[in-house]
Amino acid sequence: MRAQVLKQYDDHLTAPSWVDLENVPDPKIEKASDVIVRIGGAGVCRTDLHIIEGVWREATDADRTLLPLIMGHENAGWIEDVGSEVEGLKKGDPVIVHPKITGGTCLACRRGHDMHGENGMFPGVDCNGGYAEALKTSVRNIVKLPQTLVPKEVAAYS
């Protein structure tokens, strides 16, 4: 699949080559709760520029192993594939993707505050995101949309 890949940080957003369009492996179902979303739209915000600038480098990439990274944390699209435990979703369903993947078992998650979950990943920030043709996430992060909503028009709301 094609993806927009961040290759190096650029403190001043001056280099034209900090992001490249590349062919990368398609995401694969690995866990029973995994969902693959075919991306229909991905938002761009100041967070993305902060990632390029390396503002959060010490928090998300202290050991300097994160790059290359597929950015994009505001995503919507259509279900492409689901793991064996996923119910109520089928290929082609329009969805919006909650930006943080969490386990759902820590106290914060059980209280409904999963943005503060202990064992989370943030696609597009500290693992591959949605500036690609497809994104792997968890069923916990999927919100099914009505057929009347177009993913590219709602992606930035995720």
Feature locations, PLM:
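Extreme N-terminal starter segment of soluble prokaryotic enzymes
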Residues: 1-2
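N-terminal glycine-rich cofactor-binding segment
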Residues: 5-29, 46-81, 96, 114-128
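Short glycine/proline-enriched turns and hinge-like loops at secondary-structure junctions
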Residues: 14-18, 90, 157
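Glycine-rich beta-strand-centered segment in the early N-terminal region that forms part
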Residues: 25-43, 57-107, 141-149
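NAD(P)H dinucleotide-binding glycine-rich loop of Rossmann-like/cofactor-binding domains
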Residues: 64-66, 73, 103-158
